[in-house]
Amino acid sequence: MSLPIRNDSARHRDAEQPLAGDLALRRARLHEFCGPARVMLAALVMAKSRGPVVWIRPGWWPERLNAAGLQPIANPSRLLLVRADRDEAALWAAEEVLRSGTVPLVIAETAAAPGLTPIRRLHLAAEAGAEAARRDGGTAPLGLLLLPGQGGAPGVESRWHLAPAPSRSLLWSGGEIWTLTRLRARLAPPARWHLTHEPHGAERLEPLAAPD
């Protein structure tokens, strides 16, 4: 009689979403991206994920998410864009999609940092979605909250800041270099890296001095 063998390494991979290099985000939780390049960071995560992506944005913002600009990084055909008329509506939509367990990546942008209660609701929705996905053989959802400036939503699993870091050494290759900062995380200390993104999609992560 053959016995079922549990693949713990695969289970571990399914529990995390790659971010950059050996950095990863815990699924079934809500993480925060902030800084001037937060949309770029979300696009990089989207490129490493599989399945549909729901991206919720404030409907009153004049800026639009540019599918043509997204194309070199991630496939925009996977994207469902939702325009919310207020921050509360964006958070409600994110909560409902996370709870369904049918969408592996849910991205919500808001104009201001939510309070602790909405964040807790999003965590609970992501956990419920993970259970639903497990029953259906799917992937546990990951929630990303994009906030302007330094962010600051209470209770998030982790907070990441991305900003451009121009470098003459990359001008010849057409690559881009960013400063990626882990401002806080439940299971890791603050840290900082140079993240290099080349036109052909290759990435390089170089540690820097930790932020103060």
Descriptions of predicted regions:
Residues M1-R11, T196-P199, E206-D212:
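Extreme N-terminal leader/targeting regions
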Residues M1-W55, G59, R184:
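Detector for small/aliphatic-rich hydrophobic stretches
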Residues K48, E96-S100, R135-D136:
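Conserved catalytic network of the ASCE P-loop NTPase/AAA+ motor domain
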Residues G51-P52, R78, L142:
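Residues at the starts of beta-strands that form the adenosine-phosphate
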Residues I56-L122, Q150:
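Long, charge-dense
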Residues T102-S167, L171:
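A contiguous pocket-lining binding segment that forms or flanks enzyme active sites
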